[in-house]
Amino acid sequence: IVLIAPIWNFRMPAIVEGWIDKVLAPPWAFKFKQLWGNYGYPIGNLKQKKAIIFCTYGSPRLAVTTFFLNLPIRRLKRGVFHMCGIYNIVYRRYFAVPFVSNEKRKKFLEDVKKTALNL
């Protein structure tokens, strides 16, 4: 699974979130093992799969990693992919994209290319 999206207000755009809700959903991506009543735990059906996520941020790295405790990463890794059984996750982040030089943007794109070629 490859996701490429900006992070807006510490979330992916609604169209990406909607895709996640529709595609990575039970019973295809995971199912629940019932313990008792309405209580249970997820069992992922995508255990041998890999996820690669490319995200751009308008914020600097310090704000996202320090003040907001990597919230977008934790939401995606734990709340989506781990539930589906995907633990092989490559997460590439590019910070302060609107404010960097064109040379830095070219380095970002080169990193995307290198990551994609190593699939």
Model-based region annotation:
Residues 1-77:
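Helix-loop-strand module that forms the ligand-binding subsite of alpha/beta enzymes
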